[in-house]
Amino acid sequence: MKELAIIGTTASGKTALALKLASEFNGVILSLDSLCVYKFIDIASAKPSADELALVPHFGVNLLMPDEHFDVGMFFDVYKTAREFAQKNGKNLFITGGSGFYLKALLSGLTPKFERVESGLSNAQIYELVSSLDPEFAAKFSANDTYRLQKWFDIYSFLRSSGRDEAVSAYLRENTLAPVASNLAIFELSWDRDELRARIKERTRAMFEQGLLDEARELFARYPQRPKPLNSVGLKECGGFLRGEIKTQTELEELICTHTAQLAKRQRTFNRSQFESKFSGSVKGCEGKIIEFLKG
């Protein structure tokens, strides 16, 4: 079994390439998309069609209702299930989608982040507090380790303000995710900015032809509380249109294109800064490198 990730911005062609290669090279696909996990969000998420989902085994698709919670820890479980299935059945695992944060967490793990709290205490005073309340944590660093002392105090303050009396070390043990993926080959589809904008415009128009507004209308009627997935690019703007905040469909399409391009820019920046060891190239270039990797 070989594992690889195909990343890139929205509208870069990740899904199509993953489907093509997974069908040719005995693969399964793990969706790296925070919207595809939800049922009923089909057009807005550019989810593979029913025929495409039937062509290749998929994981991470249609798991939850739009008002249900999904987080990176749950994604880890889906990844483990997909990997075990691929290993058991002698298949290759293709990971693809636009949620680069999930991929980064698979490779590097995840530690909770907390707001900095000014203690007004010296290192020695904090260390004395740590030693008395959390000797397990204190045993791992010196009294001069300013960074870890501050980190401990930040978490300690968070727990106390939440009415919890558990030790910081116990909290971290339960809430820190260790890396679960290694030796993962990463391929990034890259496009010229103007070409990508044209693709975004074309895809947005196609989504409207497929019934994006009808999908949005049904979702907002079913979930008037507007859960987080309904605030994603595409659905959020459609909601504004349906409420009369956006006056014309032309304006709506232009707004979705603009916000999608902004999302693509953020995705591109994240992928470039977080994944140093990867191959970046055109769709054709990446396809050739992936085939070379799979045959190697």
Label each region the model flagged.
Residues 1-296:
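Phosphate/pyrophosphate-binding catalytic cores of soluble transferases and nucleic-acid-acting enzymes
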